Amino acid sequence: MTPETRYAKSGDVHIAYQVMGSGPIDLVLIPGLFTHVEHQWEEPSFARFLGRLASFSRLIVFDARGAGLSDQAPELPPMEEQMDDVLTVLDAVGSSSAAIFGLSQAGPMAILFAASHPERTRAIVLYGSYASPRRQEGYPW
């Protein structure tokens, strides 16, 4: 069963989000490049993954600005605006602090969120991620 999709306003942009589960901690899954909160349930393995996360937490998922059901953006917004969208969704669901799960490309933004908002960050989880999206001095990959 697909959870209800709701919207939170971040500046002039509507951010689509869903909440499922009722565990003792809030867990916000920050999406990678491609997201769609309703279509993600159509992929059986990803739906099982989300269900497992929701079995021990109150899982909060959202579509990034410019993707899925969130308002479209003419270009990829700066990481700081994306970080504000996470705050907007946390505020909309009444979460004072959450474990932040950065999936793939969302890893750097999850790190920035945790560093900028330690009072709202209970823990940080990175999966399939990286510290920098491109080669730079001090990060030669």
For each predicted feature, which ranges?
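Conserved acidic catalytic loop of the alpha/beta-hydrolase fold
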Residues: E80-A98
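Conserved HGGG/HGGXW glycine-rich cap/lid loop of the alpha/beta-hydrolase fold
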Residues: Y7-L69
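Flexible "cap/lid" loop of the alpha/beta hydrolase fold
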Residues: I111, A115-S116, R120-W141
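Short beta-strand immediately N-terminal to the catalytic nucleophile in serine-hydrolase-like folds
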Residues: I100-G102, Y127
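Structural signature of beta-strand start/N-cap positions in the alpha/beta core
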Residues: R58, S97-A99, T121-A123
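Gly/Ala-rich beta-loop-alpha elbow adjacent to hydrolase catalytic centers
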Residues: G102-A106, A110
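Catalytic nucleophile-loop/oxyanion-hole region of alpha/beta-hydrolase
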Residues: D71-M83
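Short, hydrophobic/aromatic-rich segments at coil-to-beta transitions
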Residues: M1-R6
